């Protein structure tokens, strides 16, 4: 069964919904699905409070696909590793296995976190939609969220055709600069020279291993804190 995880705004805790669908060998975008796991049981922690005299912790929300949602396998998501004393994942936003950009835009809720992290586009790499039109959807995601401080993340290597991932990441970087978004490439240490994954860092040439997700969380953590100002 294909399991998908949603991150839903609107409560003090994250609400996680697991939807069951017909079994399939590939997603609608031609990408292999994630290995399946049981439904997640944990919710995000309540918003932490700062001790007297200490700065308020930075909260962030996310919009993404399986790189973030990981079909309930918490150890595979970078969000499991990015928190620190001064930073926490609110559990809000939206992420789903196999989601293309248009689906993310349609489901992005209104948010009030300090920073929005958008890690998106892998499921559109083989799309005939022009790069500029895809970037317009990224902007629409940001507008729907209502968050002022935005961090755009590069997508991981895409071994079926590394050139597609490289081109999308270059377009994201340039667009972020012009739009006033922060940008981070947390996967730079997990690629080899042709732009594909280090073989030890991926389960399938598209998704990182849990250890690779943990490595990617380090630059993401620094970039989120910097984006918060």
Description of each model-found segment:
Residues 1-16:
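N-terminal export and membrane-targeting signals
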Residues 13-16, 21-26, 162-229:
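Catalytic His-Asp segment of secreted/periplasmic serine-dependent ester chemistry enzymes
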Residues 26-97, 102-112:
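Serine-esterase "nucleophile elbow" of acetyl-processing enzymes
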Residues 59, 115-117, 149:
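Structural motif
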Residues 63-66, 94-97, 119-123, 153-158, ...:
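Active-site-proximal beta-strand/loop segments in catalytic clefts of secreted hydrolases
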Residues 71, 125-129, 159-166, 193-194:
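Extracytoplasmic/secreted cell-surface and envelope-processing proteins
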Residues 101-135, 155-158:
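Oxyanion-hole/transition-state-stabilizing segment in secreted/luminal serine hydrolases
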Residues 122-123, 142-169:
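Active-site segments of SGNH/GDSL-like serine hydrolases
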């Amino acid at each position: 069964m294909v399991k998908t995880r949603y991150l839903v705004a609107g409560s003090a805790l994250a609400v996680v919904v697991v939807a069951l669908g017909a079994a399939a060998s590939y997603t609608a975008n031609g990408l292999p699905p994630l290995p399946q796991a049981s439904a997640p049981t944990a919710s995000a922690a309540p918003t932490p409070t700062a001790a007297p005299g200490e700065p308020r912790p930075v909260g962030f929300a996310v919009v993404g696909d399986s790189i973030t949602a990981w079909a309930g396998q918490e150890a595979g998501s970078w969000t499991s590793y990015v928190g620190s004393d001064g930073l926490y994942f609110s559990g809000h936003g939206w992420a789903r296995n196999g989601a293309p950009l248009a689906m993310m835009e349609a489901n992005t809720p209104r948010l009030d976190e300090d920073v929005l992290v958008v890690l998106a586009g892998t499921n559109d790499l083989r799309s005939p939609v022009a790069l500029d039109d895809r970037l317009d959807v990224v902007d629409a995601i940001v507008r729907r969220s209502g968050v002022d401080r935005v961090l755009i993340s590069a997508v991981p290597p895409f071994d079926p055709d590394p050139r597609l991932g490289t081109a999308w990441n270059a377009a994201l970087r340039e667009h972020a600069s012009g739009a006033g978004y922060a940008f981070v490439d947390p996967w730079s240490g997990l690629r080899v020279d042709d732009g594909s994954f280090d073989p030890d860092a991926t389960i399938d040439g598209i998704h990182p291993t849990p250890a690779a997700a943990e490595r990617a969380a380090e630059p993401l953590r620094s970039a989120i804190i910097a984006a918060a100002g």
